[in-house]
Curated annotation (Swiss-Prot):
Keywords, alphabetical: Cytoplasm, Metal-binding, Nucleus, Zinc, Zinc-finger
The keyword Heme appears for this protein: no
GO molecular function, one term: ubiquitin protein ligase activity
GO process annotations (BP): negative regulation of gluconeogenesis; proteasome-mediated ubiquitin-dependent protein catabolic process
Higher taxonomy: Eukaryota, Fungi, Dikarya, Ascomycota, Pezizomycotina
Name of the molecule in the record: Protein fyv10
Start and end residues of each CTLH domain: 164-221
């Protein structure tokens, strides 16, 4: 009884390992929102304080007319009103993030109030998490409209990152269509964070702009290309010297060249590379997993079920029309077999074997009585013969050998 209670006791901390991004993303968004406020205040302070001091000194020294002083004050008031509007917008964004964080914390706290895996509340909580994982997978796959509709129907809009992934997919799509403007704007907004990134997204985007200028073949624009390289590429000379030297060599090769690496630089596949690079950089900055959370959850379960017989040459039920069994193994299913292919085998501390094991000539082991009963049920096996239920091979009963387990 004690062992049964232990096996069904819920360990909330282990369950929450998969849900770390649930709180990381709002935290990162709140941090970025605060940085935006800080930058706005610093920028306006650097303008207003010197302007106010200058206007006051000019008024005391009678070096400008009252109208000029009023005009200077009006300009400062206008700047401060603009700052107020921006601050109000950022405050609303902060409130939205805080409300989102509150609901996510409440969702995770519910798990700590569930004592057992057998509790009906755990089934309800798990259903919500499954909905979250499915929506996360849909968003990463580009099905943003369907994901949004599902989130609204399930009432979990605050538990999924709709806006984050929608923006990510929009920019990634623009890159696949050959447009760098949105991606560069995103880089400018996250310039400080990108300095710590292990990816060189902004350099690759500027390099692509350089390539597109040269691709025109207009030698008159080569001067523009060199000016672009001097302004945007040379700052990376210490870390990207090889790429910059190749970019310089690109001036001597037409767009239909067959010489590498210039052929690959002109290739349209670079746009797909840039799109994938942006997604990796975006996920890194927001502490998002590079793989869908649904895949991570499935991988853990698949590894617990996988056995050496999975993914063997005999796993497909269609491979042998004489097979008497249909595979219901999730590891071998069409939908999951590729995901499970590189998963490790399950570790079983206990083994369960028949009490009369025998081995067939093909090396497969079965319980003798169970094998004989199954061969009789098939009906197409001659007397004195047995059929391997996995491979469909037929052997003489005399070929069965007893197996002894030490």
């Amino acid at each position: 009884m004690a062992a049964e209670l232990t096996s069904t006791k819920l360990n909330a901390e282990n369950h929450l390992l998969l849900d770390q991004p649930l709180l990381r993303v709002p935290h990162e968004l709140a941090r970025r929102n605060f940085k935006s406020v800080q930058r706005l205040v610093e920028r306006e302070r650097e303008y207003v304080l010197p302007a106010l001091k200058e206007a006051a000194n000019a008024s005391l020294a009678n070096t400008q007319t009252p109208d000029q002083t009023l005009a200077a004050l009006d300009a400062m008031i206008s700047r401060m009103q603009g700052l107020k509007r921006k601050m109000e917008s950022l405050q609303e964004e902060e409130k939205r993030i805080q409300e989102q964080s509150r609901k996510r914390i409440q969702h995770l706290e519910c798990l700590h109030q569930i004592p057992s895996l057998a509790d009906v509340k755990y089934d309800q909580w798990s259903r919500v998490r499954l909905d979250r994982l499915v929506i996360d997978h849909m968003l990463r796959s580009g099905y943003t409209a369907s994901a949004q509709q599902l989130a609204q129907e399930k009432g979990i809009v605050d538990l999924v990152d709709l806006d984050v992934f929608t923006q990510c997919q929009r920019i990634a799509q623009s890159l696949r269509h050959g447009e760098t403007r949105d991606a560069l704007q995103w880089c400018n907004e996250n310039k400080a964070a990108l300095k710590k990134s292990r990816f060189n997204l902004e350099f690759e985007l500027r390099l692509q702009q350089y390539i597109e200028i040269i691709r025109t073949g207009d030698r008159g624009r080569f001067i523009d290309a060199m000016a672009h390289a001097k302004r945007y590429l040379t700052p990376y000379i210490e870390t990207q010297s090889m790429e910059i030297h190749r970019a310089a060599g690109l001036l001597a090769f037409p767009r239909d060249t067959k010489a590498d690496p210039y052929k690959s630089m002109y290739s349209s596949d670079r746009w797909t590379y840039l799109s994938d690079l942006f997604i990796r950089t975006h996920h890194e900055l927001l502490s998002l997993s590079s793989r869908p959370l649904l895949h991570i959850a499935l991988s853990a379960g698949l590894s617990a079920l996988k056995t050496p017989s999975c993914h063997s040459e005999y796993t497909s039920p269609s491979s042998n029309s004489l097979s008497t069994t249909t595979s219901v193994c999730p590891i071998c299913s069409t939908e999951l077999k590729e995901l499970a292919r590189n998963m490790p085998y399950a570790h079983h501390a206990k083994s369960y074997v028949e009490n009369d094991p025998i081995i067939l000539p093909n090396g497969r082991i079965y319980g003798q009585q169970r094998l004989l009963d199954m061969s009789k049920k098939v009906g197409c096996v001659e007397t004195g013969k047995v059929k391997d239920p996995t491979t469909g091979e037929i052997f003489d009963e005399s070929e069965m050998k007893k197996v002894y387990i030490m």
